[in-house]
Amino acid sequence: MARFDLSQYATVEERLKTFWADEKNSDARIITLNHSKDSALWIIETRIYLTAGDQATDLPKTTGWASEANSDAFALERCETSSIGRALANYIYSGSKRPSREEMEKVARMDWLERAGSLGTIEELRDLYAQAKANNASQEILEGLKLYA
């Protein structure tokens, strides 16, 4: 179970708003590239260019990479969002904590699923599911736990 307060982490949306509000980024571009090699794992690279000239010469100010298991219909979107957030953090938009809220949500999600992978019986999985539900785990996590049964 996660031992951190998600409200202490900026969302990628908040970082993007700060980025675009900065006048020096008025000509910037945020480009995402799919580097996935198979259907099991999404791998996304984000490149931030501050000017058209930087993009034309392929000189990004910064990059960010993220990966996400292709576990549901929204895995690609989460991966792209995380990649953008990492690129912004690698530049100057990390806020008070470097990881984005979305990245920390992934950690929280992984805690339950990782724990499920180490259990050996259906009864243990049922107990874990009940704990996750009692702790307000997302529907996505609960559905992921069901896959272990």
Which residues make up each language-model segment?
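Solenoid-repeat scaffolds in large eukaryotic assemblies
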Residues: 124-128, 141-142
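Repeat-associated, polar segments at repeat-unit boundaries in modular proteins
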Residues: 135-149
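Polyanion-binding surfaces on beta-sheet-dominated domains and ring/shell assemblies
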Residues: 1-119, 123, 147
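Short, polar loop/linker segments at the starts of domains and inter-domain junctions
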Residues: 79, 128-129
